[in-house]
Amino acid sequence: MGSTRRTALIFGVLFLATFVFSIGGLALYSPALHPAKFMAGIGGATRARLGLSCEVLLIIANVGTAVVIFPILRRQNEALALGYVTARLVEATFIAIGIVSLLAVVTLRHDAGASLLSDAKALVAVRNWTFVIGPGFWAGVGNGLILGYLMYRSGLMPRGLAIFGLIGGALICISGLGVVLDVFNKGGAAQVIATIPEFIWELSLGIYPIFWGFKASPILEAGPASA
């Protein structure tokens, strides 16, 4: 297996891992998002901790996708390739803040139970907003707009799929800002619909490189350069 094929395989596996850890993690820690019930003892604390551990692994996978592909993408445009790494780090930072917030909720439940419900609600609110700004905005900037553009220009992925990334990234950014500005409801129909192209794009970033590798592209033969 050549180095480029190996990079494509690792890149794809990491992208699929982001789906597994994000969906699996949310399923496990979701009771903690309902502080009134959680602080009253409904939903296991161990289950929540396992879910938040998945979120930690999600951060590793998120950043890993950018680090693994950077040496190749920099040959297309080094500034944008670095921008992709930065966008993933910013997204990961917001995810980390959300993790800490929910771990604090678990601690409050263990130490004081329902007596600190208002504090738990505030921490859950922090986590919810980190989700809006992190995966709900910066994922659109990084995976959608920047990576979509780089893949479109380089031809490493089918350009039809890369267009999904560009459209999806723009829609994610618009819907995320719309939620912040109270134009759209958080988790409402507009935001859900806006995620569909980005979902297709990110899923293809996991599946296509694993089974077919990257498409033939001049940047796979060229040295580092900006374009």
What is each residue range found by the language model?
Residues M1-A227:
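Hydrophobic, aromatic-enriched alpha-helical segments typical of multi-pass transmembrane helices
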